[in-house]
């Protein structure tokens, strides 16, 4: 009797061992293994006990036992294979025999050949077996196999005991010292057995994969196409009709318990839902002797559930492929509560009908079509672990002579479906993961397509529609694009304009539905029909859109921003008062329509799917997938529109640059005039001096001075700069400076002259190449091009276009870009004669030098420069060191106004302060914020103090280290020290109430005294007896407890709000200056003691000595000393002494 053939989840891991077709079955001995392990692992063998003979039928994946003779076509390894393979098999036996009884370890396993004509991929059913040996294996062969295994184990044990630790260390030392020799021995002389054992050791040390369904089966399933999956051994249940009776007769020899367990194992690990359902119906037929069966799966939403026939009328002879094809061709949908299966699904109760035609719920239409008569029906629900209905199984007519299903059949059916419910839910989850994986792959491909098709909107939308149609299996797909006024010039800026968060959140309640419809007017329509139809792109008119029902539905979605899933189009049109177009509605069954939005959540289009291929409505799952498509579609369309508009903006920018270049370039008349001018010598402009000033130079002289610097550095002839090009470039640079108060062309000239003086007078040209000198002079002249009078912080706060364009060193990057723009303008390229390598080098120098004028860059580089100087660095020719040196020189030149003579420095400081105050006013006006002290006009009196801080933090440390390293630039350091003393003096005077900033010069710092100069002050006597009198001598009743605001004194009177008043101080100022000039005062002044008696520093120590004054003021103090009351005098403070010296 031949062994039966059935389906098994592990059949794909089995190897057929068969004799020629038509021959008798000859069992062949296979590799021994544990039967318990075979029943628990999908990759292990599954033995079957065949009736009373108890013959063990099993397989082991990968081969046969040593000495076994494989049949023709076998995939097993013959006994005459290499010794390496033999060692692998023996090692496998040793692993399987560990910690197990000898009788169990030597239970033989065999596999019978399938009957003639049976498919090689057919699955086999296996049940637990005894431990009897196969009759085809002789006792001598079995004994030889056991002896071979024993000898292998003894040899390994002996090797482990004889090898000492010293031997192991010696071998390890040889391997470490001569790895090449060991590798050569392995490749040339190592025996195969040693190589095989080495491979085993390596494999055993590898980490094992986690035993998971997704680790093997899922990846296998993903790699296979649907065709391959249907033809794979584990998925095929469509064996020939002639084999099924054989299988049935064999299983009938099993007792009920063994058969039940075997059929449970048959479906336990099956993940293909089609194969699983086919196995369930076939196995249920075996258990209950039913003629045929059907299986329905629950679908739909919680409020609208229905059953779908997965497989219908499956008999023992129905092949899987035929069953699946028939179910797909004639999809049967049964709502819950309708018919026998629907009633079972709704009530979760079993129905056992003995006579079907007498039951009102029975539908005889199928019998009429097929000619088959249904007598008995047993229908039972399939539930998951939570008790929810996931399907219904139905069997029809018994075949063993009984006319109805008894209680025993019901119990067997119920018990078996309990296990089947677990398998079905697992298979459904696996199918969902497979679908999700495929969807993700499609979405990834879609994302890839989006990035590939950035420059063509039509190709992009066509790709998106094709992917959506293939994934969701719909008949047609359409995309409507909303009119974005792309032709308007203002829209080009709107596309890239940073969105206003408040504006995007604001909702205008006054907008009506019709107004929104007008804004969301469609201009482009993309349509994609069947599989072999090309996409159609059109621009429908308003009348065409208003007469199309599909367009009206899309218009509704675009206006409301809602997703609509329409099952009945006619009813939806009637409910929403839309115009019905008969030509479209008649062929439309279901519509899924969704808005397409951009990054600002603005509707830019509508995607529409029409009619699913199987005629059913679109599900929530379809809507979720389509939502992902809509998101990708929105990103793709938005990006493509951005790209198209960016191209337009680039074209627009080129036009603007052409216009800017024309207007930024100096005129031909100016160029010719400067070319013909005579350039004076450098000494006449005082170019070699660090005390250079441009105050006496007219604008044309400034350009001539720049030309002289280029000539003196021999740059014109060295780099073959055409003279007219150089003149035009200088004039163009001057033209591109804005007329701000400080950062203008004059400032650029002073910075360039300081660099020239450092190179020539300071002898820094010794450390520079001619190309670097050219780059530094160009950088100095261009380092503040197009300066707007505001700093980088202001650009960032106001979120100006420059701050968006450049995130760091905003203005410096803009200055460099303007420099490049001028050089690229026609007739302005002074680098035109340079080689490409020299051009790159000089442009790199210019860029680095201009960016170094940002004080933030200075602070980053200063520590590295100080470290080099402190280490005694004298070689500055390295690239990094040269870059640091040039950066420090640029900063030194940029702030060099602080080292100019005092009569120049205080005027420049006034210009800087005015520009800063203008920025502070803008911050108050535009940002509604309080500016910092240096930019706050209301704190202008603090400027001297801030100047001292600026010198101490930035200027003096820089000039000191440069002076220590390069002593020829000492004048910069000395001039800075001198100006610091002047600013410190002014700061102390401001603390005493003197201000200066409202004057163009600082010649008359006591400016408040001139406020009421026009008023005639009469009869005011002012006699200066002393500037420091004892408080108690004048006011004996006042002591230290007297409130300060009640005390009178000269300090209060000297302040702007003092008791003396502006008129008195104006007269005082005139008198003091007239006295200094030697002229006689017009009015005899006497300073009342009540206004000047208070000491300016209450904590000053007393002294019996009286201070002396010089000049006429000293004489005034001496002559008036007799009018004092003789009170005790105190010493003057330091500040009082300075005030006396001023007076």
Curated annotation (Swiss-Prot):
Q: State whether keyword Cell membrane applies.
A: yes
What does the record give as EC number?
Answer: 3.1.4.35
Biological-process GO terms, alphabetical: cGMP metabolic process; signal transduction
Question: Which Pfam families does UniProt cross-reference here?
Answer: GAF, PDEase_I
Which positions bear Cysteine methyl ester? 1140
Output compositional bias ranges, type Basic and acidic residues.
Answer: 1036-1047, 1090-1100
Matching entries from PROSITE patterns are given as: PDEASE_I_1, PDEASE_I_2
Propeptide stretches in the record: 1141-1143
SMART domains referenced in this protein's UniProt entry, alphabetically: GAF, HDc
Q: What name does this protein carry?
A: cGMP-specific 3',5'-cyclic phosphodiesterase
């Amino acid at each position: 009797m031949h062994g039966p053939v059935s389906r098994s989840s592990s059949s794909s891991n089995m190897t057929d061992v068969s004799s020629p077709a038509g021959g008798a079955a000859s069992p062949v001995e296979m590799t021994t293994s544990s039967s318990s392990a075979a029943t628990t692992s999908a990759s292990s063998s599954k033995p079957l006990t065949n009736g009373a003979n108890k013959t063990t039928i099993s397989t082991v994946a990968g081969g046969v036992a040593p000495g076994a003779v494989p049949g023709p076509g076998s995939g097993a390894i013959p006994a005459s294979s290499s010794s390496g393979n033999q060692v692998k098999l023996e090692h496998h036996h040793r692993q399987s025999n560990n910690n197990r009884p000898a009788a169990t370890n030597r239970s033989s396993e065999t596999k019978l050949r399938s009957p003639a004509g049976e498919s090689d991929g057919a699955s086999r059913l296996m049940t637990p077996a005894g431990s009897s040996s196969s009759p085809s294996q002789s006792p001598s062969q079995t004994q030889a196999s056991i002896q071979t295994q024993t000898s292998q184990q003894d040899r390994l044990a002996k090797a482990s005991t004889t090898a000492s630790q010293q031997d192991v260390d010696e071998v390890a030392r040889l391997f470490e010292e001569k790895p090449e020799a060991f590798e050569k021995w392995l490749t040339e002389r190592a025996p195969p057995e040693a190589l095989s054992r080495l491979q085993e050791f390596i494999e055993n040390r590898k980490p094992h994969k986690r035993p998971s369904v997704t680790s093997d089966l899922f990846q296998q399933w993903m790699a296979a196409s649907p065709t391959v999956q249907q033809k794979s051994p584990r998925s095929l249940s469509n064996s020939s009709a002639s084999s099924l009776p054989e299988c049935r007769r064999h299983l009938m020899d099993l007792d009920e318990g063994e058969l039940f367990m075997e059929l449970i194992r048959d479906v336990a690990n099956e993940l293909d839902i089609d194969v699983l359902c086919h196995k369930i119906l076939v196995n249920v037929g075996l258990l209950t002797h039913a003629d045929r069966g059907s299986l329905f799966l629950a679908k739909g939403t919680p409020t609208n559930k229905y059953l779908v026939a997965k497989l219908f009328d499956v008999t023992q002879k129905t092949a899987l492929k035929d069953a699946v094809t028939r179910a797909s061709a004639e999809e049967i949908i049964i709502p819950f509560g309708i018919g026998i299966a629907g009633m079972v699904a709704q009530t979760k109760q079993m129905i056992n009908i003995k006579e079907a035609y007498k039951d009102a719920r029975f539908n005889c239409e199928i019998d009429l079509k097929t000619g088959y008569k249904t007598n008995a029906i047993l229908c039972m629900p399939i539930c998951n672990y939570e008790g929810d209905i996931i399907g219904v199984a139905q069997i029809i007519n018994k075949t063993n002579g009984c006319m109805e299903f008894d209680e025993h059949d019901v119990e067997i059916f119920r018990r078996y479906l309990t296990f089947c419910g677990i398998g079905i839910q697992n298979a459904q989850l696996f199918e969902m993961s497979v679908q999700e994986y495929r969807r993700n792959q499609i979405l990834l491909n879609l994302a890839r397509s989006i990035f590939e098709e950035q420059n063509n909107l039509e190709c992009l939308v066509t790709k998106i529609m094709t992917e959506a149609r293939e994934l969701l299996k719909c008949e047609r797909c359409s995309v409507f694009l909303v009119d974005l006024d792309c032709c308007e010039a203002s829209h080009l800026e709107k596309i890239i304009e940073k969105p206003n968060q408040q504006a995007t959140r604001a909702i205008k309640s006054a907008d009506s539905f019709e107004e929104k419809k007008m804004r969301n007017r469609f201009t482009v329509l993309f349509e994609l029909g069947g599989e072999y139809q090309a996409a159609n792109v059109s621009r429908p008119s308003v009348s065409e859109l208003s007469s199309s029902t599909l367009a009206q539905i899309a218009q509704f979605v675009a206006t409301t921003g809602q997703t609509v899933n329409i099952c009945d189009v006619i009813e939806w049109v009637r409910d929403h008062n839309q115009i019905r177009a008969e030509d479209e509605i008649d062929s439309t069954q279901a519509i899924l329509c969704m808005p397409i939005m951009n990054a600002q959540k603005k509707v830019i289009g509508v995607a529409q799917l029409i009619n699913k291929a199987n005629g059913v409505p679109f599900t929530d799952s379809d809507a979720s997938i389509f939502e992902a498509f809509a998101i990708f579609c929105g990103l793709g369309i938005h990006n493509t529109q951005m790209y198209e508009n960016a191209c337009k903006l680039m074209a627009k920018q080129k036009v603007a640059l052409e216009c800017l270049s024309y207007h930024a370039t100096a005129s031909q008349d100016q160029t010719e005039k400067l070319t013909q001018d005579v350039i004076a010598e450098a000494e006449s402009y005082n170019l070699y001096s660090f005390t250079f000033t441009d105050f006496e130079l007219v604008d044309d002289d400034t350009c001539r001075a720049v030309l002289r610097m280029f000539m003196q550095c021999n740059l014109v002839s060295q780099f073959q700069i055409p003279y007219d090009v150089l003149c035009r470039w200088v004039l163009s640079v001057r033209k591109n400076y804005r007329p701000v108060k400080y950062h203008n062309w004059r400032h650029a000239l002073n910075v360039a002259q300081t660099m020239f003086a450092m190179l020539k007078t300071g002898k820094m040209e010794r450390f520079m190449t001619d190309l670097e000198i050219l780059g530094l002079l160009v950088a100095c002249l261009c380092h503040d091009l197009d300066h707007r009078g505001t700093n980088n912080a202001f650009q960032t706060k106001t979120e100006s276009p420059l701050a968006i364009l450049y995130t760091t060193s905003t203005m410096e990057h803009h200055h460099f870009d303007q420099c490049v723009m001028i050089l690229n303008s026609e007739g302005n390229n002074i680098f035109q004669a340079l080689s490409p390598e020299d051009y790159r080098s000089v442009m790199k120098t210019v860029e680095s030098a201009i960016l170094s004028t940002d004080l933030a860059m200075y602070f980053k580089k200063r520590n590295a420069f100080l470290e080099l100087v402190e280490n005694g660095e004298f070689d500055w020719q390295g690239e990094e060191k040269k870059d640091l040196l040039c950066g420090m020189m640029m900063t030194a030149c940029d702030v060099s106004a602080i080292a100019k003579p005092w009569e120049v420095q205080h005027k420049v400081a006034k210009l800087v302060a005015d520009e800063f105050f203008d920025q502070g006013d803008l911050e108050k006006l535009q940002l509604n914020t309080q500016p910092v002290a240096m930019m706050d006009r209301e704190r202008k009196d603090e400027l001297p103090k801030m100047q001292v801080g600026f010198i101490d933090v930035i200027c003096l440390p820089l000039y000191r280290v440069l002076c220590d390293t390069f002593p020829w630039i000492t004048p910069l350091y000395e001039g800075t020290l001198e100006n610091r003393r002047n600013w410190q003096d002014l700061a102390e005077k401001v603390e005493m109430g003197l201000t200066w900033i409202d004057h163009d010069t600082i010649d008359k710092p006591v400016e408040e005294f001139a406020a009421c100069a026009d008023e005639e002050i009469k009869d005011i006597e002012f006699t200066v007896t002393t500037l420091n009198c004892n408080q108690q001598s004048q006011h004996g009743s006042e002591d230290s407890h007297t409130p300060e605001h009640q005390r009178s004194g000269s300090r209060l009177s000297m302040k702007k709000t003092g008791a003396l008043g502006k008129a008195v101080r104006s007269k005082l100022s005139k008198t003091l200056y007239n006295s200094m000039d030697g002229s006689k005062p017009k009015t005899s002044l006497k300073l009342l003691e009540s206004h000047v008696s208070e000491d300016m520093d209450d904590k000053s120590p007393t002294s019996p000595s009286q201070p002396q004054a010089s000049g006429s003021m000293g004489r005034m103090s001496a002559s008036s000393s007799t009018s004092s009351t003789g009170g005790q005098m105190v010493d003057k403070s330091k500040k009082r002494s300075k005030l006396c010296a001023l007076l």
